[in-house]
């Protein structure tokens, strides 16, 4: 197992959750959510995060239907990942993110009740869960 740092993204049309993780420990932490305008992020905000955290790899969650089929948002998330690669030259991988938002809400509610459920927190924790699931899949 290497000691690469990995940045995870929970793509959405209004907000994109971001988390950072370490392969060596298999852990991740939420960073923040970046506002998006109909799915288009503020690329300057993403560039700042990439410069600050210097990830070796990017993981983008794919919002699939429960039966595993793709939907419109899945195509848009894939396009977002391809643009990340094109703009910043970083390796991008994709991870099935079914139910991560539900799990993120449950995790946050356990910690702080309804007041902990703001959109930015949910998106950040969703990105964290995507990263943790990706690392678990890679290294068991």
Curated annotation (Swiss-Prot):
A Pfam family reported for this protein in Swiss-Prot or TrEMBL: RuvX
SMART domains, per the entry: YqgFc
Annotated SUPFAM superfamilies: Ribonuclease H-like
Nucleotide-binding found in the keyword field: no
InterPro entries recorded: RNaseH-like_sf (IPR012337), YqgF (IPR005227), YqgF/RNaseH-like_dom (IPR006641), YqgF/RNaseH-like_dom_sf (IPR037027)
Subcellular location: Cytoplasm
GO cellular component: cytosol
Top class in the EC scheme: hydrolase
Major location category of this protein: cytoplasm
GO biological process, alphabetically ordered: rRNA 5'-end processing
Disulfide cross-links: none
Function comment: Could be a nuclease involved in processing of the 5'-end of pre-16S rRNA.
Protein family according to the UniProt entry: Belongs to the YqgF nuclease family.
Protein name from the UniProt record: Putative pre-16S rRNA nuclease
Organism: Aeromonas salmonicida (strain A449)
